[in-house]
Every structure is written in structure tokens, then in C-alpha cells.
UniProtKB/Swiss-Prot annotation:
<dbReference type="GO" id="GO:0032543">
    <property type="term" value="P:mitochondrial translation"/>
</dbReference>
<dbReference type="Pfam" id="PF14955">
    <property type="entry name" value="MRP-S24"/>
</dbReference>
<keyword id="KW-0687">Ribonucleoprotein</keyword>
<dbReference type="GO" id="GO:0003735">
    <property type="term" value="F:structural constituent of ribosome"/>
</dbReference>
<dbReference type="GO" id="GO:0005763">
    <property type="term" value="C:mitochondrial small ribosomal subunit"/>
</dbReference>
<keyword id="KW-0809">Transit peptide</keyword>
<feature type="transit peptide" description="Mitochondrion">
    <location>
        <begin position="1"/>
        <end position="35"/>
    </location>
</feature>
<comment type="similarity">
    <text>Belongs to the universal ribosomal protein uS3 family.</text>
</comment>
<dbReference type="GO" id="GO:0003723">
    <property type="term" value="F:RNA binding"/>
</dbReference>
<keyword id="KW-0689">Ribosomal protein</keyword>
<keyword id="KW-0496">Mitochondrion</keyword>
<dbReference type="GO" id="GO:0005743">
    <property type="term" value="C:mitochondrial inner membrane"/>
</dbReference>
<protein>
    <recommendedName>
        <fullName>Small ribosomal subunit protein uS3m</fullName>
    </recommendedName>
</protein>
<comment type="subunit">
    <text>Component of the mitochondrial small ribosomal subunit (mt-SSU). Mature mammalian 55S mitochondrial ribosomes consist of a small (28S) and a large (39S) subunit. The 28S small subunit contains a 12S ribosomal RNA (12S mt-rRNA) and 30 different proteins. The 39S large subunit contains a 16S rRNA (16S mt-rRNA), a copy of mitochondrial valine transfer RNA (mt-tRNA(Val)), which plays an integral structural role, and 52 different proteins.</text>
</comment>
<dbReference type="InterPro" id="IPR026146">
    <property type="entry name" value="Ribosomal_uS3m"/>
</dbReference>
<dbReference type="GO" id="GO:0005739">
    <property type="term" value="C:mitochondrion"/>
</dbReference>
């Protein structure tokens, strides 16, 4: 038989499980669990939803049918700073989505080669070339100052979003 020994204002005494003392009872949470499993892919619908090549394939096809969107050596055995690279990737993606509002046609590809950071993007032809030149120079200068390394942007323009298939 399990019994607990509580020492407090009432002194040490042996009790069975009761709610008289705070140390002698257990708490039970009755809120529902919010950790639901969801697949990280686009759901199949009536065939009227346009998706890109990256969205059409599930994540388990990475390195088989599609490539990595972030290329760096942080995940190799013995390498450090994998968490910092992930945070930097999130910041870079949000920065680029904010700098080119509504102009990015697909996901960014981030490449780290030595000390250089390369950002590859497919943009829509919504702005004039002069505005794109300004935004590229602005982004490269500001990100080079933030990361203390050379940052290069490689942009490819398309007239409209590239649709791989309809789901």
C-alpha cells in the first residue's frame, strides 16, 4: 500500500491519498489534445486547384523527385549550427516575401557555398525592371550587412505562375 509522508505546517504524518494537503493529491488535466497528425502535402480536391512542382510532391520525395530548398553543410555529422541555419532560413524567406510582395512565383532556394549566400527565386513580371534592380540591390546590400558575408540574388522572371498540375 502506497502512503506519502508530508511535512509542512501540520508536521510529518502518514496519510493515505487525500485532498486535505496539497502535496497528497494529483492533478488531472481534462483539456483535449491538440497534437493532431497532418500530412505535409496538398490535399487532393476536385482537380481545380493549381499546384507547383514543389507542392505536388510530398516531403518524402525529397532527393528522389525534388530537391532541397536549403543547401548547406549544417546537417552533416560533426557540423555545428544547424539550428541557427534553420532560423536564418526562416528569416530570409520572410524577408524576401516582404521585399517582393506578391511577386514571388515559387519557393526560394537558399544555397550556402563557403562564405557566400546565394538566393535563387522565380519572380513574376509585375514590376518594371528598374524596380527589380533596386529591390535586388537593396536586398543584397542589407542582407550582406546583416550576415557579414556576400549575398547574391539570382532572379528568373516568368509571365505568370508556373502550374505543374491540378489537384
Amino acid at each position: 500500500m502506497a502512503a506519502s509522508v508530508c511535512s509542512g505546517l501540520l508536521g510529518p504524518r502518514v496519510l493515505s491519498w487525500s485532498r486535505e494537503l496539497p502535496c497528497a493529491w494529483r492533478a488531472l488535466h481534462t483539456s483535449p489534445v491538440c497534437a493532431k497528425n497532418r500530412a505535409a502535402r496538398v490535399r487532393v480536391s476536385k482537380g481545380d486547384k493549381p499546384v507547383t512542382y514543389e507542392e505536388a510532391h510530398a516531403p518524402h520525395y525529397i532527393a528522389h523527385r525534388k530537391g532541397w530548398l536549403s543547401l548547406h553543410t549544417g546537417n552533416l555529422d560533426g557540423e555545428d549550427h544547424a539550428a541557427e541555419r534553420t532560423v536564418e532560413d526562416v528569416f530570409l524567406r520572410k524577408f524576401m516575401w516582404g521585399t517582393f510582395p506578391g511577386c514571388l512565383a515559387d519557393q526560394l532556394v537558399l544555397k550556402r557555398r563557403g562564405n557566400q549566400l546565394e538566393i535563387c527565386a522565380v519572380v513574376l513580371r509585375q514590376l518594371s525592371p528598374h524596380k527589380y534592380y533596386f529591390l535586388v540591390g537593396y536586398s543584397e546590400t542589407l542582407l550582406s550587412y546583416f550576415y557579414k558575408c556576400p549575398v547574391r540574388l539570382h532572379l528568373q522572371t516568368v509571365p505568370s505562375k508556373v502550374v505543374y498540375k491540378y489537384l
